[in-house]
Amino acid sequence: MTSLINVNLPEQSYEIAIAPSNLDQLGQQMANLKLGKKVLLVSNPTIFKHYGERAITSLKSAGFEVASCTLPPGERYKNLNSIQKLYDVALENRLERSATMVALGGGVIGDMTGFAAATWLRGINVVQVPTTLLAMVDSAIGGKTGVNHPHGKNLIGAFHQPRLVLIDPDVLKTLPMREFRAGMAEVIKYGVIWDAELFAQLEASKRLDQLRYVKPELIDSILTRSCQAKADVVGKDEKEGGLRAILNYGHTIGHAVESLTGYRLVNHGEAVAIGMVAAGQIAVELGMWQKEDTERQNALIQKTGLPTQLPSGVDIEAIIDALQLDKKVKAGKVRFVLPTEIGVVTVTDEVPSDIIRQVLQGM
């Protein structure tokens, strides 16, 4: 069964297409959009080995001319050096403004490909084909693209909406357990910030820590409800003027933890899980959220096999300093997304640093 979710935007709306074996439909789906014939497929070596030829076959059978480029996996390679490599391949293959870059991979590949597409010739088409749960439910949707700076995550970037997000749930079968858990952090996030029914669904499930224990119908529901939540928020606030900021729940402290551990010790989903635990406790300390609700959230995070404690050796003062480099800082004040009930959050910059410090010391 195919699920189609519309991301309705003033300048360029697009579809999120979710269906088994969808990867084989990539070429036809792109042909339906009447995109130019030149395509640059971007992936990492592991994903390319699993799915690259299938994607290329689908594209070529629909009449596209395909070049490919593989980039090293991992957040620490999400930098301008990798973007330069993409530019070089684009130049070698004479990618014109009608061309399309296709991101086949997780969040790192999606972010870099999107940024390269946003900046090559001042903007060419990009199609997102996410292969991790995290990218499927979050980073592939909404047009945020970017790379890291040595002093902070995603400090260099642009908004550049895809022409299509194509999701094939079957590719999750080759996803390592740790990466599946990382994606579940973003799914839990949607339950806390937007969709109390999704949260209840997750609570009712016995095991969430490995894909093989999660029923296929729950995977379908997770993908559809999470993508719908992201589409709803982005449709109301494309460029983070207000509402879209709620998608950063768990990301403020999470990004600081990622950056301070060199993007090696914890992955993005694990960092977001830690950030959600911290944000939930901050909300409790400020009298905004019930203690039992933060306990429900934390129990769900633990059931998924995600961390709820800071990594050992991470300096709390360094985290507080790193928060000031977060791109969400406004007039020197750190903005936090804090829950008020399951399914509802608020954004505030009125969080005293001593509360942040106290919560982090308790983790």
From Swiss-Prot:
<dbReference type="GO" id="GO:0005737">
    <property type="term" value="C:cytoplasm"/>
</dbReference>
<dbReference type="GO" id="GO:0003856">
    <property type="term" value="F:3-dehydroquinate synthase activity"/>
</dbReference>
<dbReference type="GO" id="GO:0046872">
    <property type="term" value="F:metal ion binding"/>
</dbReference>
<keyword id="KW-0862">Zinc</keyword>
<feature type="binding site">
    <location>
        <position position="251"/>
    </location>
    <ligand>
        <name>Zn(2+)</name>
    </ligand>
</feature>
<keyword id="KW-0057">Aromatic amino acid biosynthesis</keyword>
<dbReference type="GO" id="GO:0000166">
    <property type="term" value="F:nucleotide binding"/>
</dbReference>
<keyword id="KW-0170">Cobalt</keyword>
<keyword id="KW-0028">Amino-acid biosynthesis</keyword>
<dbReference type="Pfam" id="PF01761">
    <property type="entry name" value="DHQ_synthase"/>
</dbReference>
<dbReference type="InterPro" id="IPR050071">
    <property type="entry name" value="Dehydroquinate_synthase"/>
</dbReference>
<dbReference type="GO" id="GO:0009423">
    <property type="term" value="P:chorismate biosynthetic process"/>
</dbReference>
<dbReference type="GO" id="GO:0009073">
    <property type="term" value="P:aromatic amino acid family biosynthetic process"/>
</dbReference>
<feature type="binding site">
    <location>
        <position position="186"/>
    </location>
    <ligand>
        <name>Zn(2+)</name>
    </ligand>
</feature>
<protein>
    <recommendedName>
        <fullName>3-dehydroquinate synthase</fullName>
        <ecNumber>4.2.3.4</ecNumber>
    </recommendedName>
</protein>
<comment type="similarity">
    <text>Belongs to the sugar phosphate cyclases superfamily. Dehydroquinate synthase family.</text>
</comment>
<dbReference type="InterPro" id="IPR030963">
    <property type="entry name" value="DHQ_synth_fam"/>
</dbReference>
<dbReference type="Pfam" id="PF24621">
    <property type="entry name" value="DHQS_C"/>
</dbReference>
<feature type="binding site">
    <location>
        <begin position="107"/>
        <end position="111"/>
    </location>
    <ligand>
        <name>NAD(+)</name>
    </ligand>
</feature>
<dbReference type="GO" id="GO:0008652">
    <property type="term" value="P:amino acid biosynthetic process"/>
</dbReference>
<feature type="binding site">
    <location>
        <begin position="131"/>
        <end position="132"/>
    </location>
    <ligand>
        <name>NAD(+)</name>
    </ligand>
</feature>
<keyword id="KW-0456">Lyase</keyword>
<comment type="function">
    <text>Catalyzes the conversion of 3-deoxy-D-arabino-heptulosonate 7-phosphate (DAHP) to dehydroquinate (DHQ).</text>
</comment>
<dbReference type="InterPro" id="IPR030960">
    <property type="entry name" value="DHQS/DOIS_N"/>
</dbReference>
<keyword id="KW-0547">Nucleotide-binding</keyword>
<feature type="binding site">
    <location>
        <position position="268"/>
    </location>
    <ligand>
        <name>Zn(2+)</name>
    </ligand>
</feature>
<keyword id="KW-0479">Metal-binding</keyword>
<keyword id="KW-0963">Cytoplasm</keyword>
<comment type="pathway">
    <text>Metabolic intermediate biosynthesis; chorismate biosynthesis; chorismate from D-erythrose 4-phosphate and phosphoenolpyruvate: step 2/7.</text>
</comment>
<dbReference type="InterPro" id="IPR016037">
    <property type="entry name" value="DHQ_synth_AroB"/>
</dbReference>
<feature type="binding site">
    <location>
        <position position="144"/>
    </location>
    <ligand>
        <name>NAD(+)</name>
    </ligand>
</feature>
<dbReference type="InterPro" id="IPR056179">
    <property type="entry name" value="DHQS_C"/>
</dbReference>
<feature type="binding site">
    <location>
        <position position="153"/>
    </location>
    <ligand>
        <name>NAD(+)</name>
    </ligand>
</feature>
<keyword id="KW-0520">NAD</keyword>
